[in-house]
Curated annotation (Swiss-Prot):
Role, per record: Facilitates the functional incorporation of the urease nickel metallocenter. This process requires GTP hydrolysis, probably effectuated by UreG.
Binding site for GTP: G8, P9, V10, G11, S12, G13, K14, T15
GO BP of this protein: urea catabolic process
PANTHER family xref list: UREASE ACCESSORY PROTEIN G
Superkingdom of the source species: Archaea
Protein name stated in the entry: Urease accessory protein UreG
Family of this protein: Belongs to the SIMIBI class G3E GTPase family. UreG subfamily.
Gene: ureG
Signal peptide (from-to): none
GO molecular function: GTP binding; GTPase activity; nickel cation binding
Record-level GO cellular component terms: cytoplasm
Length: 209
């Protein structure tokens, strides 16, 4: 079983990414998936996932989704004091046998990271609508995440974001750690994303090459 932490600023596409990867892992790889969401003041993301993946697509049983309302700084619940998320993990694992558990952080800044006792693998999500400056600015989330996902590349021409600049800056900041440029709306770059995720799952012994 692998715990995948997904974090990034508000509106970058974290929930959409989790929904996409869950559909892929369940339908294409035959894996069992659980999801924990963190929101500051509501369970909006958990409700959305429940409506889309449980009710509409029928990909997950309802007991595989847990929503947490943190009521404070989003990073506290995933880093400084992850106890509420650890309890949610324990609850999920008692309910059913799972291969992958996604833990979605509440929207936060580029300094956010997951505690290593909470997540085995981390994905930081940026989007081009926020501009092309973020990879170059660094921050622990961008630097230390196992995978950096730059989402909404279809919007780059409309917001003046230079994708090549973002690519160069990411390579400089992240060294040999992977970065993928995707659009979850158009499907651009999705093959690269899946290749990286599959590679990690192969290392964990969850799927075969």
């Amino acid at each position: 079983m692998i715990r995948i932490g997904v974090l990034g600023p508000v509106g970058s596409g974290k929930t959409t990414l989790i929904e996409f990867l869950t559909e892929y892992l369940v339908k294409k790889e035959g894996l069992s998936v659980g999801i924990i969401t963190n929101d500051v003041i509501s369970s909006h993301d958990a409700l959305r996932i429940y409506q889309n993946l449980v009710l509409k697509e029928k990909l997950l049983p309802k007991e595989n989704v847990i929503g947490i309302v943190t009521g404070g700084c989003p990073h506290t619940a995933i880093r400084e004091d992850p106890s509420v998320n650890l309890r949610a993990l324990e609850t999920l694992m008692k309910r059913t046998s799972l291969d992958v558990i996604f833990i979605e952080s509440g929207g936060d800044n580029v300094m956010s990271t997951f505690s290593p006792i909470l997540a085995d693998y981390t994905i930081f999500v940026l989007d081009t609508a926020a501009g092309d400056k973020y990879p170059g600015k660094g921050g622990l989330g961008i630097q230390e995440s196992d995978l950096l996902v730059v989402n909404k590349i279809d919007l780059a021409p409309f917001v003046g974001a230079d994708l090549e600049k973002m690519r160069r800056d990411a390579e400089k900041i992240r060294k040999d750690k992977p970065t993928v440029f995707i659009s979850l709306k158009t499907g651009d770059g999705i093959d690269d994303l899946i290749k990286i995720i599959r590679s990690e799952l192969e290392l964990e012994g969850l799927i075969r090459s």
